[in-house]
Amino acid sequence: MNHDVFISYSSRNKPTALAICHVLEEHGVRCWMAPRDIPPGADYGDVIDEAIVACRLFVLVFSEPASLSQWVKGELNLAFTEKKIIIPYRIDETPLKGAMRLILNQTHWVDAYPDAESKFGELVEAAERFLGRPAVGAFRTEPVVPPSAPTPAPARRYKVGDYY
């Protein structure tokens, strides 16, 4: 598997997870997320296990549905066991409980509510930092407009007898 980040999320938060994936990939961070990256006919559990083991960074889209999802809990537990860097991206005010509280209590969060897109820049910068990539400038949410073409230099005129 060839990815940097595993994105864990509840299917009820799929639009947010897809947006996070898109933004990270626009910045050159290779992402893995189910079901997008699960080959047809493959066993979900086996492929997800392999993807978490192979990732360098684990992004958890944390919400009430995620806190109740057995899949998300299992993915988080495996990431913790494998000593992955975990970045929780909180999209609502759901409190931590149970095993999630034990795992995430000492982790710095990206608090992205009520507007889940408001902290995409912070997430991109954190991912680049943890992946050891140099900062390439400020995070942009709008396309960069290229500068206009430079004005050509005036043509040089030669006189008879000039050496060039």
Segment roles from a protein language model:
Residues 1-61, 65, 70, 80-85, ...:
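Conserved N-terminal substructure of TIR/SEFIR domains
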Residues 49-52, 103-108:
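Short, hinge-like loop/turn segments at secondary-structure boundaries
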Residues 85-87, 108:
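Proline-centered loop/turn at the N-terminus of a beta-strand
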Residues 90-91:
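SF2 helicase/translocase ATPase core recognition
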Residues 94-106:
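Glycine-rich, charge-decorated loop segments at or immediately adjacent to ligand/cofactor-binding or catalytic sites
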Residues 109-115:
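Short acidic-hydrophobic, aromatic-tinged amphipathic segments that line or gate anion-handling sites
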Residues 156-164:
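Tryptophan-anchored aromatic micro-motifs
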